[in-house]
Structures are given as C-alpha cells and as structure tokens.
Amino acid sequence: MSFDNYLVPTVIEQSGRGERAFDIYSRLLKERIVFLVGPVTDESANLVVAQLLFLESENPDKDIFFYINSPGGSVTAGMSIYDTMNFIKPDVSTLCLGQAASMGAFLLSAGEKGKRFALPNSRIMIHQPLISGGLGGQASDIEIHARELLKIKEKLNRLMAKHCGRDLADLERDTDRDNFMSAEEAKEYGLIDQILENRASLQF
C-alpha cells in the first residue's frame, strides 16, 4: 500500500489526555480494516502481511476486514498474503471495492467462506498467470520458466476451484483468457458470497 503523504487525510481524536492525530489508514487499522490498493508488489504485500500479523497479536479471535482494490500483480507477493491469511487465527473477511483482478481476485476468493463480499459496481477479473517484464536468455532457461509458469497456473487454478466450489476444469477453461465479471456474476461463480448495497445488508 503506497500513498503520497499529501493525499492521506489526518484524523484528530479527542481523549482525556488531549488530542491525538492518526493518518486515516492507521485509524482504520484500529477498526481491523486492512487495505490492498493498487498493484500487488513485494512492498504492498509486506505491508498487508505485517498488518495481518499485528491484528492477530492484538486479538486472535476477532475478524479482520481486508478491502481489495487491485489490478493484480506479483504471484509470489500475492501468495505471501494468501499464506498469511490462512496462517493466522482470525477469520479474514474480504471485500472488493473498485476492482479485484488477477491476483486481486484470487485473494478476494480466499476470504473466509461466507465472509467474501463485493460492492455493487465492483469488477472482478480472473485469468491465467502472466510472465512480467519479458523473458529472454537461453532456450533451456526459457523452457525452465515455462514449466514453472505451468506449475503456478495449475496451483492457482486448484486453489481457486476449492474456494469457488467448482471443478478444476471450470477454472482451466474460464481463466484461459481475461474473464471479466460483474459483482453478480462473481457471486454466481463462487468468488464472493454476498453483494453489499449498504452496511445494513452485511450479514454473517
């Protein structure tokens, strides 16, 4: 999560000991809300992982709310978030606002079953993993990377099939090309459990 300081509002709280200033994201962290905004990178993933571990240490029995607005990004960085979501004790509820594409969609689907949400105008996109940055070098090296990419593709498809309650063949077919979905379509597919029109519609 990377925000320019001049764009981040500061919240002033009054207490018996005077005023205390928080940036808005630190204030929301107190409410157990974690954001993934923008591409999934090593830096953004490390911030999310650190916040998840911190919130577990604060209260291992209280849900964490993971808000996602991401076009996707690094598979290895995303898997560090995924593994941490499963490693910690609290349930992690996921919510898509804006978009959850590629690794963003994978993380959205990985929330606690029954606690995966999207706002009405969200867009979700699934596809097969990509090689980023262009791949060059010897033919044998390219072959090694191609085999690794196929292994990653199979693993992601198997995991997402489990989270969506679908057959592996469905994921292999439906991720072959960019596959865009509305919130309604994502719910039907099994990527989310509920569409939230407003806070009052939150049920779990």
From Swiss-Prot:
CDD domains assigned? S14_ClpP_2
What keyword terms does UniProt attach to this protein? Cytoplasm, Hydrolase, Protease, Serine protease
Q: Sorted alphabetically, which Gene3D superfamilies does this protein's record hold?
A: 2-enoyl-CoA Hydratase, Chain A, domain 1
- Enzyme Commission numbers on file: 3.4.21.92
One Gene Ontology cellular component: endopeptidase Clp complex
Gene Ontology BP annotations: protein quality control for misfolded or incompletely synthesized proteins
Claim: Protease is one of the keywords in the record: yes
Kindly list the GO molecular function terms attached to this UniProt entry.
ATP-dependent peptidase activity; ATPase binding; serine-type endopeptidase activity
Please state where this protein is localized.
Answer: Cytoplasm
Report the InterPro entries cross-referenced here: ClpP (IPR001907), ClpP/crotonase-like_dom_sf (IPR029045), ClpP/TepA (IPR023562), ClpP_His_AS (IPR033135), ClpP_Ser_AS (IPR018215)
Q: How does it assemble?
A: Fourteen ClpP subunits assemble into 2 heptameric rings which stack back to back to give a disk-like structure with a central cavity, resembling the structure of eukaryotic proteasomes.
Give the family this protein belongs to, as stated in its UniProt record. Belongs to the peptidase S14 family.
Stated role: Cleaves peptides in various proteins in a process that requires ATP hydrolysis. Has a chymotrypsin-like activity. Plays a major role in the degradation of misfolded proteins.
Name-wise, this protein is ATP-dependent Clp protease proteolytic subunit
